[in-house]
Amino acid sequence: MSAKKLYQIILCNSIGIALFLSWYLPVDHGFWASMDRAVFFYFNQHLAESRFFLYFVAFTNFRAFDLVAGACMLLILLYYFFQQNSEGKRRIICIFITMALSTVAVKLLDRQLDFHRLSPTLYFTNIHEPVNFVSEMTGWNVKDSSTASFPGDHGAMLLIFTAFLARYFGRKACLAGMILCILFSLSRIMSGAHWFTDVAVGSLSLVLLSMSWVLLTPAANTVIKWLEAKLLFPNFKNF
């Protein structure tokens, strides 16, 4: 591993730790608390003011809507997949498998980080502040609350995808991943299922700390090469 890679790992870890501690150490999360409150109530009040916005937020917070995010991620990978020769196609499949394994590993780590943080809808309800629940206003079964919102698992998954795009497919792919990450993470924030900092602090710091060791060390490439050598693949010459 080169000195440049080591520097990048140290930088990513330093930013991740500093970001997390800026939220975790201050009493009541310091300046992040006022930002969280402002973001939540900005969107929450608009649920009552705009019927279109209400149903837009409701629609994007159906569990099934997560499939749309998955489909967009798959389309990006397929775009690069069909540009490759047979060997390149096999490599992209191995990159995808490695990314999936990394996501599972981070999810398992996430479960160990039990912060017991209520979503803003539940938090403000508990302290008797009026809150609009998307599920109550529409009668739809949507994601608008959580008893363990930090760190945001939805945001972490999208950030991992973006990190892999940046590492293996370049800047344009990374930009596409960032756009997806913002759009699909925002839906949970607008519904009140997550705080802004669940994603901006929790998901981001978790991915900076974990993916730097996966993608900036030989770890990911080692797994990819092992998969290329061990797995049987169809003949992609006709694709």
Segments the model singles out, each with a brief description of its role:
Residues 2-8, 133-239:
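Membrane-embedded catalytic cores of phosphoryl/pyrophosphoryl-handling enzymes
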Residues 2-72, 110-142, 232-239:
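N-terminal transmembrane-helix/juxtamembrane module of multi-pass inner/ER membrane proteins
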Residues 18-23, 100-105, 180-192:
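Aromatic-anchored segments of alpha-helical transmembrane domains
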Residues 1-16, 89-97, 155-156:
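Alpha-helical transmembrane segments and their helix-start/interface "positive-inside/aromatic belt" motifs
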Residues 27-29, 82-84, 111-119, 192-197, ...:
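Transmembrane helix-loop junctions in multipass membrane proteins, especially transporters and channels
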